[in-house]
Amino acid sequence: MAFKDTFNKMISYFDTDEVNEVEEDVAASTDNVIPRSQQSVRASSHPKQEPRNNHVQQDHQARSQEQTRSQMHPKHGTSERYYQQSQPKEGHEMVDRRKRMSTSGIANRREQYQQSTCSDQTTIALKYPRKYEDAQEIVDLLIVNECVLIDFQFMLDAQARRCLDFIDGASKVLYGSLQKVGSSMYLLAPSNVSVNIEEMTIPHTTQDIGFDFDMKRR
């Protein structure tokens, strides 16, 4: 019996050691499980914090964008005001320039018209030659493009004939025209003047029939 009791005691001793080891293993496993759970909780808490941080960053970006927009709007308004203020000035300047150009253009046209009229203006001179030397003065007027109305009533037939020959030759050289307009009157015209005279019957009373120029005899 004593041997059996000692044997049982030995068995129970070893059994208690195994139980203690098992308990220690269980405690260690529980200790390992607890930190893992805490780590999982911490890890799960971090994803919750990240969206919050993203949301805060988005709010900050939105505020910064609003501030930049608010800063841009006054500048845009000032630029529009400046454009609106400068536009009437530019419009007035354009109107003034157009008025000046129109007035200057009108003045230039007037000057050109006056010059052209002065250059194109034709003068008719009335001459009563009394001697042969007066024919040269009549030809000089033709050179400056003046019309000359010649009346030979104060000249003799021979002198008048010589004057007419000289004037007729000069008119042909200067491309003028010499036409009879009366019993003792002739019209000398330059090349830039056209003369249209209606035919008329000139009485030949008291005139020399043999004289080709129909000059009065005095």
Curated annotation (Swiss-Prot):
The alphabetized UniProt keywords are: Cell cycle, Cell division, Cytoplasm, Septation
Output the InterPro entries linked to this UniProt entry: Cell_div_SepF (IPR023052), Cell_div_SepF/SepF-rel (IPR007561), SepF-like_sf (IPR038594)
Role description: Cell division protein that is part of the divisome complex and is recruited early to the Z-ring. Probably stimulates Z-ring formation, perhaps through the cross-linking of FtsZ protofilaments. Its function overlaps with FtsA.
Q: What biological process terms from GO does the record include?
A: division septum assembly; FtsZ-dependent cytokinesis
Asked if Cytoplasm is a keyword of the record, the answer is yes
Residue spans of biased composition, Polar residues class: 29-43
Does the keyword Amino-acid biosynthesis feature in the UniProt annotation? no
| GO cellular component entries | cytoplasm
* Quaternary structure (record): Homodimer. Interacts with FtsZ.
Q: Which organism is it from?
A: Streptococcus pyogenes serotype M3 (strain ATCC BAA-595 / MGAS315)
**Region named Disordered:** 25-115
Where it sits in the cell: the answer is:
Cytoplasm
Q: What is this protein called?
A: Cell division protein SepF
Return the similarity comment. Belongs to the SepF family.
Compositional bias ranges of the Basic and acidic residues kind: 47-63
Q: Which domain of life is it from?
A: Bacteria
